[in-house]
Amino acid sequence: MDYKHVDIQKLIELAKYDNYAQEEIVERMIVGQVKHDLWKNINPFDWENLFEKCYSNPKYVFVLLCAYKSIFLCKIDPKIPTSNTIIYLEKIHPIVKQQAKNCDVLSQNNLGFMYEEGIGTEIKINKAKMWYTLSANQGLSFAQYNLGYYYYNKAKYEKSINYFQKSAQSGYYLSNFMLAETYLKLSIPNFNEAIKNYLLAANQGCNISQYRLGMIYFEGKYVNTDMNQAYKWFKLSAKQGNYFSQYGLGRVYYSMDSTKYNCQKAINCFIKSANCGHIYAQKKLIEYYEINNNIAEMIYWCVKSSDVDKIKKYIKINENIENTSDIVYFDLVRKNLEDVGSDILYKCQLLIIQNKYFWKDNVSLCRVKLCEKLENIILKFIDWTNKLQNNSLLLLSCLSFIDDNHNVSIRHHQHTTGLIPYVKQHEFRNKKFITFDKENVSFVNEIIDITNGTDMNEWFESLQFLKLNYQNLMKTSMNSSRIYKDLILIQNLETDIEKYCELMFDEIEYGVYDRNRLFIENREYNMAKLFDN
């Protein structure tokens, strides 16, 4: 395989156990062919024999530090074993220090970064600056960039520009981006140089520069407003995963002044950006769904953005929530659910065994399938019970819609679109219960259908078919006592399933106080913040 022509993503996939893939990634990073945004994907911490290679090759140390910066310092992937990595870096530090003292230019830059971030040693900014300077003065673009960034943070912009320019001349595109940022920080901003350097970086694929250009053309900063240019740069940046640009692209689509106006495309862009946590995209969606009377989606984005004040306009706390008046009965319901659930499952499985291994008539296999279908229904009921007892976001009575028309609107939207809403209020036994999360709403829709008798027929019909099948068996079998025994088992099973369903309905009614408590105590869920006051 010619690794020099392999796509970077493929190299990343191969690198864990492939030395040649590792070498190619390292070389590409050293010459700046790997975009900064991909560093977090490389994750060399899993590479075979990585730390042994770091002892002898400063390039591997550089890659390790780049990954450390992208993953650990940005807190991208907490699953990576930080403690082990830090131990290894502490062991590597004296090796890097010795290599730097031996005038290895890349090691000097590596050591500067380790001092700057406190990697394998204490943070020592002055030493970091010293080693960066030694490396930068020998022409290493990474060190020149790091030194430029050091002066940028110190607000020494003239010195910062000097080092960013040197780094940019070596082809390091991030230096062009930082040059642009620095020109705008000057006491008299140099807009022309800023835009020039944004363009240089953007044309090399720097998505942050592409985003900045999109904003400049969209807002008409330093140049005339140009929606087509804004669209171009936002789209290029968004394709690389920049969710700020995704929001910007949405704004272009949403603008009535733009030839690209497309409301649905705008909403799709806002959703992508909002799902990455962009607060303004979330607010745009709240505004859009409120105007269009899609109350459930509006509340979803209110929850995502912690907009409790907006939620309070639609959902209220029910202050006078009674605690269950019969704790003993509630405990009995819970115990009976467990006992009856185990019993009906046992009876159903007993019928399966009977028809698989005892009865040998022509339709025994048909009865097995009926029993297995019934078994799946019983298991579903048991799973429902577990959800009712452990999910704190469904069938709550502590909250309700301020205006019943909100729930009517949600039901109408579900009926016309077929889409499950994020929040919905159901009525059961003349009481109102509210549920959050689409999966939960779908579940509650199903269970409420059973309480209304809509889906009750599924298990009931299976039992009737079983009874009929056994009655036909009596005409051909001599073992009538065994048949009667199975028929009694079926009758008992029917009675017990009815009892289990009734107990499950009691769980909805009497278990609500437990669900309310779990909901209010769940401080990680933004809706629970309604109770903060």
Curated annotation (Swiss-Prot):
Keywords: Repeat. Disulfide bonds: none annotated. SMART domains: SEL1. Sel1-like repeats lie at residues 105-140, 141-172, 173-206, 207-242, 243-278. The lineage of its organism: Viruses, Varidnaviria, Bamfordvirae, Nucleocytoviricota, Megaviricetes. This is Putative sel1-like repeat-containing protein L21. It holds the Pfam family Sel1.
